[in-house]
Regions:
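Conserved ABC ATPase signature
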Residues: 81-85, 89
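Conserved ABC transporter NBD signature motif
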Residues: 2-11
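ABC ATPase NBD coupling module
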Residues: 12-28, 58-59, 133
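Conserved catalytic motifs of ABC-family nucleotide-binding domains
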Residues: 102
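Catalytic Walker B motif of ABC-type/P-loop ATPase nucleotide-binding domains
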Residues: 106-109
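Short coil-to-helix segment of the ABC ATPase nucleotide-binding domain corresponding to the Q-loop/switch region
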Residues: 40-48
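Hydrophobic anchor residue at the start of the ABC signature
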Residues: 95
Length: 171
């Protein structure tokens, strides 16, 4: 099916492929399985993204990395490698990575899917904090009704290819 849509001011239907990097800089992505580079420490994982998106000034890069690590509560973990972190810490690095370019929108795909309930709640509190304090919109996909009921927000449910806005969720 076809339709019209825009994301953070970019019309998607006939978007010039040259504009995609600019759209991408306005989006942050949080993955279910973290997608961290295992051969780099936390700091270098974040630095890789900044370099890939055009950052050149070393001082600004360091400031930004310190800022996002502080926002997600990992200021002292920059030297650690992903395998040295808990699942919750790895997900916080993933959230930090999503924040690097100060996005207008974060797309979170099952951000609590690989986490225990307590750690899931910590990540949800972090995402709510980011949305409230920084004005970043967050669209999250989840099938976890516990998360939906514990952290109420505007909920959209899909069924048979259609979006149902503000659907009542029955547990």
């Amino acid at each position: 099916k076809e339709g019209e849509g825009s994301v953070v001011g970019y019309k998607l239907r006939d978007m010039d492929w040259k504009k995609i990097p600019f759209l991408r800089r306005n989006l942050g992505i949080v993955f279910q399985d973290f997608q961290l580079l295992t051969d780099r420490n936390v700091h270098d994982n974040l630095k890789f993204v900044l370099r890939a998106t055009g950052w050149k000034d070393e001082k600004l890069i360091e400031e930004k990395i310190n800022d996002v690590l502080d926002k997600v509560g990992l200021k002292t973990k920059g030297f650690k490698f992903p395998f040295e972190l808990s699942g919750g810490e790895q997900q916080r690095v993933d959230v930090a990575r999503a924040l690097l370019n100060s996005p207008k929108l974060i797309l979170a795909d099952e951000p609590t899917g690989n986490l225990d309930p307590e750690t899931s709640d910590e990540i949800m509190h972090l995402l709510f904090h980011i949305s409230k304090d920084y004005g970043t919109a967050i669209v999250m996909a989840t099938h976890d009704y516990r998360v939906i009921s514990k952290f109420p927000a505007r909920t959209m449910r899909t069924e048979r290819g259609k979006v149902i806005d503000n659907a009542a969720i029955t547990l």
